[in-house]
């Protein structure tokens, strides 16, 4: 089996995932997965595509991720891993699509407007 390369994005985070046959080692930016993502919810998000397709421990995954915050990075990795699982076996599509793991979340941060404090918040208004 050759190495499968897929890209996932979320907000401003970009994740590049390289999946190859192995013993289940997952490295993120040359660190172990548990060292990079310390909270349980983020670890669950990253492992979700592997759990749903029952491929935990079957593949070695090398991940390069940059940009955004820690949650955006975890969700970018989840999308890239989901795409890689579908590339490995088309039958995985049926398990991942209902969970919404193959859909790129289009929500981005709304820009700040001039004449306002933030994107939607206005400066204090004084009637008199």
Curated annotation (Swiss-Prot):
Matching Gene3D superfamilies: 3.30.230.10
Task: Give the domain of life.
Answer: Bacteria
GO BP terms: translation
List cellular component terms (GO): cytosolic small ribosomal subunit
Q: Name one Pfam family in it.
A: Ribosomal_S9
Keyword check for Transmembrane helix, yes or no: no
User: Would the keyword Ribonucleoprotein turn up in this protein's UniProt record?
Assistant: yes
Transmembrane stretches in the record are none
* This protein's UniProt keywords: Ribonucleoprotein, Ribosomal protein
A GO molecular function term, named singly, is: structural constituent of ribosome
Check the record and name the InterPro entries matching this protein: Ribosomal_Su5_D2-typ_SF, Ribosomal_uS9, Ribosomal_uS9_bac/plastid, Ribsml_uS5_D2-typ_fold_subgr
Against NCBIfam families, the record matches this protein to: PRK00132.1 (NF001099)
| Protein family according to the UniProt entry | Belongs to the universal ribosomal protein uS9 family.
Put simply, this protein is called Small ribosomal subunit protein uS9
Lineage per the UniProt record: Bacteria, Pseudomonadati, Bacteroidota, Flavobacteriia, Flavobacteriales
């Amino acid at each position: 089996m050759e190495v499968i390369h897929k890209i996932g994005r979320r907000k401003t985070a970009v994740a590049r995932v390289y999946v190859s046959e192995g013993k289940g080692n997952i490295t993120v930016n040359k660190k172990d997965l548990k060292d990079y993502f310390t909270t349980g919810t983020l670890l669950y998000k990253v492992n979700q595509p592997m759990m749903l397709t029952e491929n935990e421990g079957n593949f070695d995954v090398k991940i390069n991720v940059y940009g955004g915050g820690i949650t955006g990075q975890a969700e970018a990795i989840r999308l890239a891993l989901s795409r890689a699982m579908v590339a490995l076996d088309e039958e995985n599509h049926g398990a991942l699509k209902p969970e919404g793991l193959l859909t790129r979340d289009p929500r981005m941060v709304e820009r700040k407007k001039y004449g306002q404090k933030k994107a939607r918040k206005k400066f204090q208004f004084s009637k008199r």
